[in-house]
Every structure is written in C-alpha cells, then in structure tokens.
C-alpha cells in the first residue's frame, strides 16, 4: 500500500497517465501489444473491453477470439489509482473502431462521473457491464483483490437501468450477448419462432425461451396453411415450436421454404433453430458438403431477413467435432450457442437493451 501511494503521488505530480497498478496493462492487437503470446494479433476487432481483473481481461481476449469475435482494444486496469474505468470508457465510446463495449468492474472511484460517462456511452453504442462482487461475500473478495468498495447491488442495478447498460453475471453471458449484438439484426419484438429437430427438444427449447420472458406465439393462419401443404406430421409438428427433422430430411430447399414462410409471418419477430449434433454429426463427417450447405442456407436467410436469427448446436457426444466446426459458423457470422438457455438469456438481454 505504501509503495502504491508513492507511485500514485509520483504519477500525479508528473501528470503521468498510469495504468494500474495490479494489472496486465493494455492489449492493442492491431499494433501487436499483447497480454501474452497466445493473444491473437488482428486488425478487425470491434469489441472494446475493460477489466479490473487481469485474468478476466486475458480470458476475454482469448475466448472472444475463439468465438469469432476480436478485440479492438482492451485495458486491464487493476487498482486504477490514476486512470479509472471512466477514463477508459470515455476513450472507447469515442473510438470509431469499437462497435461494442464490454467491461468487468468491481468498483468505481467516482460514482457520479462513472454514471454520467456510462450514460453517454450507452447513447452511442451498446455497453455490457459484468459486475464483480454482487454478493456480500463477493464484495469482501473485491476489497482484498483490488481494494474496491462495492456499492449496494440494488443501487448498482438501478444505475445500470438508468444508463441503459446491458448487465451480465459472468464471462459466458457477456460473450453470448456480444454474439448477438455483432451478428444479428436488432430485435423489434419478443415473438419467437422456434425450430427443433425432435419432439422432446421442441418442448425444451420452448421452456427455455418462455422462462426467459419471451413469447412463443401462434403463427398466423396463412403460415399454418402454407406449412400444411408439405409438412410431415408423422412424428413431427408445425405448431410453434416446429418439430421438423422428418420434414427436412437433409433438404436445404425444404429448409429454405420453411424459413421463408416463417419470416413472412407477422407474429414472428425472431427465429431460433436447433441443429442436432447427435443426429447430424455422422452425416456431416461423412459428407462435409452437407454441413457447408447447411451453413450457407442459414447465412443466406440471415442476410435477406430483417429479423434476428440464432442457432443452437448442442455438442451432445460430439464435443470435439463440434468444436472443430464452430469456426465455419463464426466465419459466416452466425451466432452459435451450445444450449437453449444461453441463447434465450442472451436474446432477452439484447431485446431489453433495444427497448430501453
């Protein structure tokens, strides 16, 4: 503490913008400044990330890249004795290369300035705030970690709502929200069309999205009429949700037909589709072109539609294989999730942001 005090006084006397201490510093991939040798060097980053934790800063830079999203700039600022989170946030909100801002923060030095800066930043671009120390025990941990005195959670939550920030609880939720912000159209409503491969999964995906506060409405009469012309109801259903594996049977023309019909439905604001590794992996492995055609069809639909579209691909027993094909989805800018619950939670957060 004594050394930190001396360092702070020296920096302020010299008008020196000190990062940290107790941090990893700056990650600037475009110019090759990295936290470690594993961090990618890229010039197409769109995410600005701020972290009071060095580990979370490193983890975010690595895992976001593994999910097809690159960082424009990242600052690990630790104890923030000279430059605080508000200084970095102010920079990122004015940075043309940064489209989305995320942060992990345990506490702030100047609450009023942070509130005003965050509110202005949220007017310019989406800001996702992952707060550390949300519980009494967690707040004690932040004090020993970065010396941050956490504000009461109710006060913090109220400030986030007033500013229009998107709040998350962990790294996965933060990344999931960013997938949608960077790779889908903005939602205009909460009416979901849900497309599953089997009956059981159609129930599970419906429960997941309904529990997240999203609607699974009846389709318009015209939609039922059009689907009824060709849909196989033996072991399937074209209610909402759809149980459609027996109808599609690997035909991209049929999938395209279904997607076009649902896209035209006025009751549908967005679509979420399950791809089943449990059933499809064998075919994709044997005929890789079938996977490529599936991704191409989804990408084409996503491009022509004005409605958000997301894909859920549970690894099942094919975790290693699914991990190997994820870059194909990322390259096509398809937001890919490994569970119904994560997809639903992310969509609900982005929808709430759009309505704030």
Regions found by a protein language model. Give the residues of each.
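Catalytic-core regions of core metabolic enzymes
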Residues: 1-356
């Amino acid at each position: 503490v004594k050394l930190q005090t001396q360092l702070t006084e020296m920096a302020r006397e010299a008008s020196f913008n000190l990062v940290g201490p107790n941090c990893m510093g700056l990650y600037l991939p475009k110019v090759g400044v990295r936290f470690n040798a594993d961090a990618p060097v890229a010039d197409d980053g769109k995410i600005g990330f701020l972290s009071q934790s060095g580990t979370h800063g490193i983890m975010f830079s690595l895992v976001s890249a593994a999910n097809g999203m690159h960082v424009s700039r990242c600052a690990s600022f630790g104890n923030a004795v000279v430059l605080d989170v508000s200084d970095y946030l102010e920079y990122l909100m004015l940075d043309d290369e940064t489209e989305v801002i995320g942060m992990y923060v345990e506490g702030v030095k100047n609450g009023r300035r942070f509130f005003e800066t965050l509110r202005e930043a949220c007017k310019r671009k989406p800001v996702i705030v992952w707060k550390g120390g949300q519980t009494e025990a967690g707040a004690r941990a932040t004090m020993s970690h970065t010396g941050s005195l956490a504000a009461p959670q109710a006060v913090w939550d109220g400030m986030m709502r007033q500013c229009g920030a998107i709040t998350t609880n962990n790294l996965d939720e933060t990344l999931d929200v960013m997938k949608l912000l960077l790779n889908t159209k903005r939602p205009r409503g909460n009416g979901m069309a849900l497309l599953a491969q089997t009956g059981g999964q159609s129930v599970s995906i419906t429960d997941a999205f309904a529990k997240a506060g999203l609607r699974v409405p009846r389709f318009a009469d015209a939609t039922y009429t059009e689907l009824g012309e060709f849909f196989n109801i033996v072991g399937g259903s074209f209610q909402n949700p759809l149980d459609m594996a027996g109808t599609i049977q690997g035909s991209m023309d049929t999938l395209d037909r279904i997607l076009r019909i649902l896209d035209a439905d006025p009751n549908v604001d967005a679509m979420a589709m399950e791809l089943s590794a449990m059933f499809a992996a064998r075919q994709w492995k044997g005929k890789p072109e079938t996977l490529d055609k599936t991704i191409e069809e989804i990408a084409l639909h996503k491009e022509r539609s004005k409605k958000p579209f997301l894909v859920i691909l549970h690894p099942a027993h094919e975790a290693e294989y699914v991990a190997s094909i994820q870059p194909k989805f990322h390259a096509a800018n398809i937001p890919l999730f490994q569970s119904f619950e994560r997809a639903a939670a992310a969509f609900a957060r982005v929808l709430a942001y759009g309505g704030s």
